[in-house]
Amino acid sequence: MASWGGEKRGGAGGSPKPAVYATRKTPSVGSQEDQWYLDYPGDQWSLGFSYSWWKNSVGSESKHGEGALDQLQHDVRLEDLGELHRAARSGDVPGVEHVLAPGDTGVDKRDRKKSIQQLVPEYKEKQTPESLPQNNNPAAPSQAEGGEGGVACGTVEQMTWLCSLPHAVGGGDGDHSSTGAVGGHPRGPGEYCHLHEQRVHHHIFARGKRKGKNHVSNVVR
């Protein structure tokens, strides 16, 4: 069993560093309980250990022990643990990023990112056919899937990549060009559509492809 004393911060910043001592006490010959005690004379913090051995102990008081558990305690450097703890909490200890409180997992909920398996259902729920505007441009040229120059919108990743392509011909601003092409897609004479409608068109094609329907893909030049 180990017990920690509460840390007190009332000491002066320029006060000399108090000494740390640790002793091993065995009350009597044949006792099965050894006690380690670590303390500051300045009463800044204290640390106590109590172990039960399944062997007879030597009835004496010493700073060294016999056996594996005693050796483990002896190898621990008894330094200024109070200042080390305060420095770790303030980020002044190399190699220590964060000191966890009891029950703290160290993971910030704001840093957790959703996987693609979680994002796809949410995206499909938001982008329903009823919520998307209609693309009133039946003359949009298309090719069969897998044809030369065709780009298939089969998955969300492909759809995102396709919609992030430069949607400009000539002018480079995504508006109507002199050739009647909008968003990189050629149009017939007098038939125009906006860049937003082009993206909606891609969304509809991608959603239909996931349902297993045979849709043609838009041509990206």
Curated annotation (Swiss-Prot):
InterPro entries: C144A/B/C. Residues 1-10 have a biased composition (Basic and acidic residues). Residues 1-28, 89-151 are annotated as: Disordered. Residues 129-140 have a biased composition (Polar residues). It comes from the Eukaryota. Belongs to the CCDC144 family. This is Putative coiled-coil domain-containing protein 144 N-terminal-like. It comes from Homo sapiens (Human).
